[in-house]
Amino acid sequence: MDNIREGVRQKYAFAIANRGQGCCGSPGCCSDGLSDAADPITGNLYDESDLQGLDPELIANSFGCGNPTALMNLNLGEVVLDLGSGSGLDVLLSAKRVGPTGKAYGLDMTDEMLAVAKENQRKSGIENAEFLKGHIEEIPLAAKSIDVIISNCVINLSGDKDKVLKEAYRVLKPQGRFAVSDIVIKRPLPEKIRDNILAWAGCIAGAMTEEEYRGKLSRAGFENISLQVTREYNLEDPSLRGMLEDLTDGEIKEFQGAMVSCFIRAAKPA
């Protein structure tokens, strides 16, 4: 797991330090959340109305695969935690929705991301947000302290997803909600992709099947589990082919249509 974690950390540190060049060293791996012209995973995720008052640079540095703040009706006064908060977009959107009596935490392991997130918070003038350094497998918050957990294309990056989901369950209050966007695969990936760190950092190699996701959430204690497909990816896209270079053309065609983004919802029992 340490090798995966360090590989992911390096890729996203590079992405935020070289904004506009892509997290994998080429254009298209990580682009803004408004236009889908450049990137098959991160493009066209947010409505412009949601982003009013936020710095355009913040929007351009969102590296997710969905809009988890659209998943859940956040209530005034609630406490939200974003696992793998990156440059802070979903944290700041959540903070606006829960109002001054609520709070939004962002957790990230990458110093470069945290620095940018804190600067974005300063520019936005939002006071009810806090960014924490740490790992999503070891959440530095008390048990039963969070109303809603969100995450945006991050859980697939972990080498120990069981631990992530158990930690999420631990920090949620009874009846707390789990609402994330993540990459899901319809069929298992070939082992040669699973061993490719570039494909891990690109949100491909660590993706779970729907059955795996449901099983791990259930074993962690969650109930009312649902997965909703929101986007299907074209593996012929040049941005994805660079991470799938170990596959033959025949294998690409065989796996076509098997990689999707999903909204994943679950709840902690009362």
UniProtKB/Swiss-Prot annotation:
Pfam families: Methyltransf_31 (PF13847). One of its GO terms (biological process) is response to arsenic-containing substance. SUPFAM superfamilies: S-adenosyl-L-methionine-dependent methyltransferases. CDD domains: AdoMet_MTases. It catalyses: arsenic triglutathione + [thioredoxin]-dithiol + S-adenosyl-L-methionine + 2 H2O = methylarsonous acid + [thioredoxin]-disulfide + 3 glutathione + S-adenosyl-L-homocysteine + H(+); arsenic triglutathione + 2 [thioredoxin]-dithiol + 2 S-adenosyl-L-methionine + H2O = dimethylarsinous acid + 2 [thioredoxin]-disulfide + 3 glutathione + 2 S-adenosyl-L-homocysteine + 2 H(+); arsenic triglutathione + 3 [thioredoxin]-dithiol + 3 S-adenosyl-L-methionine = trimethylarsine + 3 [thioredoxin]-disulfide + 3 glutathione + 3 S-adenosyl-L-homocysteine + 3 H(+). Keywords: Arsenical resistance, Methyltransferase, S-adenosyl-L-methionine, Transferase. Its EC number is 2.1.1.137. InterPro entries: Arsenite_MeTrfase-like, Methyltranfer_dom, SAM-dependent_MTases_sf. Gene3D superfamilies: Vaccinia Virus protein VP39. The keyword S-adenosyl-L-methionine applies. One of its GO terms (molecular function) is arsenite methyltransferase activity. It comes from the Bacteria. Belongs to the methyltransferase superfamily. Arsenite methyltransferase family. Catalyzes the transfer of a methyl group from AdoMet to arsenite, producing methylated arsenicals. Involved in the conversion of As(III) to monomethylarsenic and the conversion of monomethylarsenic to dimethylarsenic. Reduces the arsenic toxicity in the cell and may contribute to the global arsenic cycling. This is Arsenite methyltransferase. The lineage of its organism: Bacteria, Bacillati, Bacillota, Clostridia, Eubacteriales.
